[in-house]
């Protein structure tokens, strides 16, 4: 039987709205109970948004659990803008640490959400400054020195991966804080010698401006040096967008966010996404008739053995 694209799109919208959205909402409740989260956002084009042109930029936000969580949760949320109020609304009920990049919107969140900066972004700024120099001038340049400081932190962090959060906290103060102190002292000295609008000047400005957030990871051994975990989770959506390019309607963008969320959460927990979604859709209609908490029972954490990826 040949099915039109419109028919298949309508099926996805209906399935998302009737069954998958409830599972998403149950995951959302669990996510907001975690002590440490990661956030990121990327642009998405939605053609038929009320009151906006078809070329307007909309956003897909991402929120996910950290490495200290027992069960991984990865949630996407479509919103028409990048306003901080969207993150605040999504994270209502959450109190804890939030890994994010340098976007100022995160810094306007309520005080019970403590933002942790991303050293991968800081290092990237120095890498960009290094890239503006001729090859023969890169070695021992200020940009190379700044990049070296950042890379030293990542190298030290690798050796702490298997420690408990308590042990990691102590080791960071012992090993990484001296590097941070030296880096800040160097950056403050370099600022006076560097053109503010140069690539190096921008890297130093980013470092100084973000310093209170970049050093937050020292306060809790559960925290991570970077927000790479969120960036990796955003990548499947970004790569998918290169194929489908845009969403037609806000409803379609919302359905995409729900479906991507369940697929990526399933993958993060070692489940086969197809088998997991099949299990959800086979059980949701019947369970929903008899059990008010049916969506909880269909979370990835409760999936049967046959939903898991085969061991290699």
Per-segment meaning from a language model:
Residues 1-312:
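Catalytic center-proximal scaffold of phosphoryl-transfer enzymes
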């Amino acid at each position: 039987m040949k099915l039109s694209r419109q028919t298949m799109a309508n099926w996805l919208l209906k399935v998302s709205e009737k069954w998958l959205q409830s599972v998403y909402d149950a995951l959302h409740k669990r996510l907001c109970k975690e002590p440490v989260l990661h956030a990121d956002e990327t642009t998405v084009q939605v053609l038929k948004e009320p009151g906006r042109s078809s070329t307007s930029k909309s956003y897909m936000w991402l929120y996910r659990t950290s490495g200290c969580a027992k069960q991984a949760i990865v949630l996407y949320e479509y919103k028409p803008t990048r306003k901080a109020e969207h993150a605040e609304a999504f994270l209502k009920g959450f109190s804890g640490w939030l890994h994010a990049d340098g976007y100022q919107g995160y810094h306007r969140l309520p005080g019970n959400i403590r933002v942790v900066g991303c050293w991968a972004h800081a290092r990237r700024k120095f890498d960009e400054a290094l890239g503006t120099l001729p090859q023969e001038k890169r070695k021992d340049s200020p940009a190379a020195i700044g990049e070296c400081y950042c890379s030293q932190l990542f190298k030290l962090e690798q050796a702490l991966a298997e420690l408990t959060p308590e042990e990691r906290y102590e080791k960071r103060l012992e090993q990484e804080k001296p590097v941070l102190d030296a880096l800040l002292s160097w950056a403050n000295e370099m600022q006076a010698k560097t053109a503010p609008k140069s690539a190096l000047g921008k890297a130093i400005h980013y470092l100084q401006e973000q310093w209170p957030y970049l050093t937050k990871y020292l306060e809790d051994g559960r925290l991570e040096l970077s927000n790479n975990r969120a960036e990796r989770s955003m990548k499947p959506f970004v790569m998918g967008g290169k194929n489908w390019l845009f969403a037609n309607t806000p409803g379609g963008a919302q359905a995409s966010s729900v479906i991507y969320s369940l697929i990526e959460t399933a993958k993060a927990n070692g489940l086969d996404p197809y088998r997991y979604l099949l299990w959800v859709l086979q059980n949701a209609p019947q369970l929903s008739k008899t059990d008010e908490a049916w969506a909880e029972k269909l979370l990835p954490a409760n999936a049967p053995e046959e939903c898991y990826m085969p061991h290699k």
